[in-house]
Amino acid sequence: MGLSRYVPASLRPRAHQASRTLRRAAGAVPRSPAQGRASAERVLDRRIVPDEQRRALLLRAFEARARLATGSARDQASITRQALGLGRRLTRLGHPAAAVRVYTAGEAALREPSQRLLLTVQRTALELRRGEVPADLWERLADLLALADRHLDAGDTDTAGTRLQEAYNLAFHRTLHFEDRMSPLAADPDAFLAPLRASAAHRAVETLTPRERPTATSGAGRPHRLLVTTFMNWNFLGGILDDYRATPGVEVRTLDLQQIPDGPWRAQPVDLVKDRLRQTRSGPPLEPPAEVREAFDWADTVFVEWGHRALSWVSMLPEVSARVVVRVHSYEAFTPMPLHTDWAGVDDVVFVSPHIRALVEAAVPGIHAVRRHTIVNRNLLDTFARPKLPGAEHVLGLIGWNNVTKDPAWALDVLEALHRHDDRYRLRLLGNEFDRTNVTGASAAYRATLMRRIEAFGPAVERPGFTDDVPEALRGIGVILSTSRREGTHEGLAQGAASGALPVVRNWPYVARWGGPASLYPQSWVVETPDAAAARILDLAGSGRLGSASSDAAEWVRTQYDWSVVRPRLDEVLLGPR
């Protein structure tokens, strides 16, 4: 491995033993350098890294190598390569703590700030993924932003964009905003965004780009042309597309930006930031393939679903005469995409809830240049009005529970509070099991604790799994819970209320400051604690008012949020002139 001459004398016997193990495991003498490297890598993956003692020796050898590093450019570059390679290998093989040690040792050895930051980005991202907030996170974020500013000042928008995106990756990491802690953006946008706003590169991408948009062509005598575009996620669009395709006088096309040919127009996050910086420096415009350009030229209205990649991408397109309407749900508000969108290229933005709108308005300066609307998602709520099954009044329901944001542990707290008074109550968790893949350390720890609690409740907690027939499943549920830490609208809550289940809604803590569920639903539905949730249920059941309260909630939600009520408002935005 080229490290033996850097190993301290006290460790050399063990290092030689490890070297012999490598040679024995490698077998035949390699016939080429490439074959030799491949053989050594197999031994590392199969014999060295999985073994605790050998892995510890490997780490100590690298740390010794890093401590004895010289300041020569060649030696510094070697340290960087070795740290990146070894750190990624350890991460891939399931040893993130060891990878953090490697990156930390490499950072201490490197003299050149930009080279050291290559390891810093890997180390801090890995710590965040493990569910830990690095003690030096904000200092390193400032380093990345300062480097982005220097490259931008030198006219290197590509490198500036790379460094700026790395800063966004850290500042908006899911551990900070979507896992087991309050999002610092939602808690205090000004304080959270202050380091970004101090950066010239970030201020550049937030600045609206002056432009003259061409006059829209007349649609007289032909159908209104609606182009619907997104990046991969069509979850909330299926019914809407069907409805508009069936509407006389409307012609619909769709465009998934993930499916367009690869090229300089890619909608990858780092490319979007680079393109945005080039745009602010009067660089060449973002020009898509001819067939994509034709679709935008064809359209009278472009409906961009999700305020994420597609939003930033479409906002930079030149010469768009169509009306550009974007819809923002909840997730996107906690990403950097709305911040580096060129809002000069957008006409209208639709928010699915007032509290998400309030948060984005506080965080994103450019949004104030755009007409803003609040229109909830499509829901055919009349289909949920079905008779309840016997015993449903003692069944609590939670629709969708397989992530930390839904916080199903809070539902267990409610059940526990109810059982202190009446052990007939059960909790039914509808939907897929708690996710095991692509989770952070915090999410994995949450799941482990949750599953232990569920097992302890025995038959009082039911997990029937995913169902395609939610209206039928709701017949057996008499109380619909919303236990989330953050929501946009919570479709399952609206559907449950429409079915005649009593709605009991936690005051979603991550967005409570911005209005929370009370910005969408009656205040009487909202509670602060599990004990208050249990008290609402027991009080209405004990007084004989459970049935009437549930009926009133069903009537209210259907008259407010059924698609028959909501669609005319969306029609006005999508089908009107620019």
Describe the predicted segments one by one.
Residues G441-F466:
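Nucleotide-activated donor-binding/catalytic signature segment of Leloir-type glycosyltransferases, i.e.
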Residues L502-R506, A512:
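Short hydrophobic beta-strand element within catalytic cores of glycosyltransferases
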Residues L389-K406, L412-H419, R428:
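Conserved donor-binding/catalytic core segment of Leloir-type glycosyltransferases
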